[in-house]
Amino acid sequence: VRSSAASDVYKRQTYTFPLFYEEWELEKSNITTAWDNKGDIVIGNDVWIGYEAVIMAGVHIGDGAIIAARAVVTKDVPPYTIVGGTPAKEIRKRFDAEVIQQLLMLKWWDWSTDEIRQCLPYIMEGKINELLTRNKERL
């Protein structure tokens, strides 16, 4: 271990106590106000998140989105969009705009178990046109 002249880790505490610089008088009941809360992470339905992906606070992941492995997501991801990288950027849409709109209206994830079971082959095999045709009355 090397220590620079500005930081002698052998003689003093190395923790910087950031909470106490500006909020020393803060009551324990208000401790979360010391940090900038960017909001909850909201993950839609039918989303796939790759291994070790990081999603930052306040980000919304749209229905049907795919997050690549080890992506760092700092901004909202639109529905049925594939993103990857650091920071995550759009790679492409999973479907054309019309199909995306129909899938968002279809909301198959809200169906009963029996309804999903009947359409499972279409969903699992990626037969989106057949799924939409079979369920036109829902659109």
Regions found by a protein language model. Give the residues of each.
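Single conserved hydrophobic/aromatic residue that forms the stacking wall/gate
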Residues: 1-6, 10
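Activation loop
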Residues: 5-6, 39, 69, 99
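C-terminal segments of enzyme domains that contribute to small-molecule binding surfaces
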Residues: 14-55, 87-139
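Left-handed beta-helix
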Residues: 39, 44-45, 50-51, 56-57, ...
